[in-house]
């Protein structure tokens, strides 16, 4: 448990330090990246989940391919000298048996392990994607279909704002032509779609309606991270998502919450991942139909 506490505090302090040094949060990248998308395990091709995505977003590497030391070695690759691993985690369920009643119970225990980026590999030309011309046209149909499959109620209007209204269970957003780019429109829509999952019939998240309250800021953080995960899923550059820079009202609340509770970002990332998984489940249902 002591090691778990240290890991929570280490990740939290790294995020705070990252913000202080870069004046941005780790999931906001002010540049385009030819290797954009979710950070993945090079061996399994699976995406890292929740807090692990955020930890890997803080790395200085552009490649989104990662592996453990042994997995790189088994594939015939060698690390560059003095390469340092990036610590990430998983939760292992431990069993406890009550000596009096013989009843079994389980509790999650955090386990830490290290991964290395493809850019830390010697002779890595086969691992690094070549820069591609940036597409000016977003695959709009793909995201439109994704949103439509959720059956979320979308209301377009001409005001310069976007929000999810709980009591009507509807998403309100400006017309796409009012945005600077289609990227900004869809990133904003995905942000509000993450809010939409808070409804009691979906992920059932409780949130305060008071602007700038801790509960309100926490829900905004969940939607912020959820939108980023979805942008990565659709391989959209966060550099194009100007909405990510519009949360200065919440940053002080987030930083204070991080300082007060080392598990705060872990909880938010877990809720964001749960929301994304919920939204993705609609796509699986449609494909199976």
Language-model features and meaning:
Residues 1-289:
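N-terminal accessory/interface modules of nucleic-acid-binding and processing proteins
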């Amino acid at each position: 448990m002591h090691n778990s506490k240290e890991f929570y505090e280490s990740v939290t302090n790294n995020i705070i330090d990252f913000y202080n040094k870069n004046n941005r949060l780790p999931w906001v990248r002010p540049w385009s990246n030819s290797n954009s998308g979710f950070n993945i395990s090079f061996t399994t091709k699976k995406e890292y989940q929740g807090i692990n995505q955020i930890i890997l977003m803080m790395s200085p590497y552009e490649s989104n391919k990662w592996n453990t030391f042994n997995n790189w070695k088994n594939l015939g690759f060698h690390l560059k000298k003095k390469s340092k691993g990036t610590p990430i985690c998983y939760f292992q369920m431990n069993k406890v048996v009550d000596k009096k009643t013989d009843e079994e119970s389980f509790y999650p225990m955090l386990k830490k392990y290290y991964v290395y980026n493809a850019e830390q590999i010697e002779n890595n030309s086969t691992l690094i994607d070549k820069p591609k011309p940036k597409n000016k046209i977003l695959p709009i149909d793909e995201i439109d279909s994704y949103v439509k499959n959720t059956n979320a109620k979308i209301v377009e209007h001409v005001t310069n704002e976007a929000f999810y209204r709980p009591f009507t269970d509807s998403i309100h957003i400006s017309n796409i032509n009012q945005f600077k780019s289609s990227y900004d429109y869809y990133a904003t829509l995905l942000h509000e779609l993450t809010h939409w999952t808070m409804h009691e019939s979906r992920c059932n998240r409780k949130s305060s309606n008071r602007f700038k309250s801790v509960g309100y800021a926490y829900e905004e953080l969940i939607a912020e991270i959820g939108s980023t995960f979805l942008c990565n899923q659709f391989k959209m550059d966060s550099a194009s998502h100007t909405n990510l820079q519009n949360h200065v009202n919440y940053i002080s609340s987030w930083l204070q919450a991080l300082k007060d509770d080392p598990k705060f970002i872990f909880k938010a990332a877990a809720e964001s991942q749960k929301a994304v998984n919920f939204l993705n489940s609609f796509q699986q249902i449609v494909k199976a139909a």
